[in-house]
Curated annotation (Swiss-Prot):
EC number: 3.4.24.-
Protein name: ATP-dependent zinc metalloprotease FTSH 8, mitochondrial
Residues that, per the record, bind ATP: 375-382
Region (Disordered): 1-50, 103-131, 202-221, 781-822
Organism: Oryza sativa subsp. japonica
Record: transit peptide: 1-93
The protein's required cofactors: Zn(2+)
Domain of life from the UniProt record: Eukaryota
Any GO BP annotation: mitochondrial protein processing
Amino acid sequence: MSLASLARALSRRSAPSSSRARQGFSLGGLGGTTRSPPPPSSPLPSLHGGEGGGLGLGFVRGYLTAALGRPAAVKAGTDWRSILANPQFRRLFSDGSKKNYENYYPKGKKEAPKGDGSNKSDSKQDSSTDDQWNFQETASKQLQNFLAPLLFLGLMLSSLSSSSSDQKEISFQEFKNKLLEPGLVDRIVVSNKSVAKVYVRSSPQSNSQGQNTDAIITTNDVPSKHTPSRYKYYFNIGSVDSFEEKLEEAQEALGVDPHDFVPVTYVAEVNWFQEVMRFAPTVFLVGLIYLMSKRMQSGFNIGGGPGKGGRGIFNIGKAQVTKMDKNSKNKVFFKDVAGCDEAKQEIMEFVHFLKNPKKYEELGAKIPKGALLVGPPGTGKTLLAKATAGESGVPFLSISGSDFMEMFVGVGPSRVRNLFQEARQCAPSIIFIDEIDAIGRARGRGGFSGSNDERESTLNQLLVEMDGFGTTSGVVVLAGTNRPDILDKALLRPGRFDRQITIDKPDIKGRDQIFRIYLKKLKLDNEPSFYSQRLAALTPGFAGADIANVCNEAALIAARSEETQITMQHFESAIDRIIGGLEKKNKVISKLERRTVAYHESGHAVAGWFLEHAEPLLKVTIVPRGTAALGFAQYVPNENLLMTKEQLFDMTCMTLGGRAAEEVLIGRISTGAQNDLEKVTKMTYAQVAVYGFSEKVGLLSFPQRDDGFEMTKPYSNQTASIIDDEVREWVGKAYKKTVELITEHKEQVAKIAEMLLEKEVLHQDDLVRVLGERPFKASEPTNYDLFKQGFQDEEDSKNQEAAKTPQPDDDGTPSLGEVVPT
């Protein structure tokens, strides 16, 4: 019988049961004592609930009284009766609808609403009511699932723990003097050969008049004779033989006839509370393991993070795949990808083939098995793969290369098999493996792979799945990496990755397109096209991720300044923040150091201004940025694919301009030129030892490894000495020319330095006022020309608008829009 039906039955019988609770109905204890018949004036309620024949409260009270063997259980039963009879408590265990709330139950709404004139407010109210009821229903079901076991467990533990609270422990001497000598002992039950339970005769007056049954001892704490016995006292015995001997001696001393000796019975009882507590740690441990296994299967698991779709301990060999299809939300399309038109065209061929395979099959063409996206970090490899998933319209399975590696042996190959099996089941499909270099590294040689056995097994399984004996068509594999040089050659061969699509950093046109995409999402004071070209000119060498960071930094700076729109000043501050680091205006710098930095940066500006092949200066500042830079000069370099010897020489001179200015104008040098000297040394060594510009070294090239693990030089010591002497000579020539240039324009260098000390930041317009126009004109427009072109167009438009506004006549007659004071 369910708890709901039990509660309803108890509520129906609550009133009669409460009246019968005061009547003389008593059950014996566990020792088997018989009931005393009630007086004729008090009818005894039946065990099945009296007249109704149902399960009444008397049965529950009687059962609890018999089970606990104590009168206190009657009071506890009365308390439980009032709780169970509460309608709100019964409603927790009922699946039926509440009274007068049937219309609010979603399950009861089977008929469609009549008419179509319902307004939106009613529908919203109904939906909110349904959501509220769904939450209440879910909470109620969860409460039903947990409350019943907890209630039963609490009732059992409370009854078991307090079952012996009404029994009093006495000594054998007290038993002999107060109970055995007056002849009040009815019988003795020895439990488990250790405890002697004494059943004494209770007072008949306590049952007939409804008094407290705990008062079984009459005046002077002596019970009456010839009454039904109850278990009230107990004492511990050392051994059965000793107890029987002492009991027999005591009764013989009292002159009791052997036929009237107190009967002694031996029982083996189970203390349920002790048994439960003994098995409680084991049950708790088993339950904990069960809950952990359920949680691992639902999300928090081995081999995967928390969340939906995690791998359990029994599913650790399955790949955790992010699957997308045509119904997925938050898709990325090819129109959201810019700056890599050639790579996008190659990827779009895969999409076109999957959508229209007959067009290619009629020509005898086969779709490539895979394509490897290669490029520097932040160029949009993963974004291009997301666009492929959004445009293809076929299932797209994405996984990271590190997801194949696990602490268990054999998990990697198993996940590769599971991944391709899932892809073949929904073919045609696309698999994208991001950062494939985690499992695609070149295998070890000579059997000395060591700890890479698991990775090599995973790679072997990937090779077999892509182009092996049992390979099936319809699955295209895309992969992304920025380390193609370390991949295994077997992975790069045609038949597996047929194409290598290189995604380089965007040029100025690509950056313009990328800026247009990100600027559409910002609140600007002008159109996105107003900023895109000049920002593209200001950010040479920036990848797509860097451009996104610039836009985000500009928005943060505008929000920090409590601005409602983003302006060009915010974008320039964002670019300075990314290039130079965090601005530190509060950094403590002495006046002498600040003056040295000002002359150093002024030397860079003047040297670059009067050198033909030097990059044009955009801005110079002495505001400290980053961790070490006390000032910097920002240039707008041209993205030249080829560099001449003269260009490199002028760039070397410009880099040495700060050191030359310190020597010429201040008269002493500082450590501020350390970074400049490092750049000059690297640039000059490249000219001599790599580019073949030196006549003494000849047409030889010794490129250095980028990783710095080159143990031996690929040339002799004599050649190394020639290279060192040549580099030293070239740097000396460049520095000599720079000193002459700074000496020639000493006054201008000092004037710019004083302006820097006053303003801290100078732009090209300030330099033009001091130095005049640059004496060199480029034959083709440079990045700086493109940057200035936007401002020139803005000034022209303002001038045109000013020309269109009406002007006052010469005779003093006011125009239409002029206000004349009176």
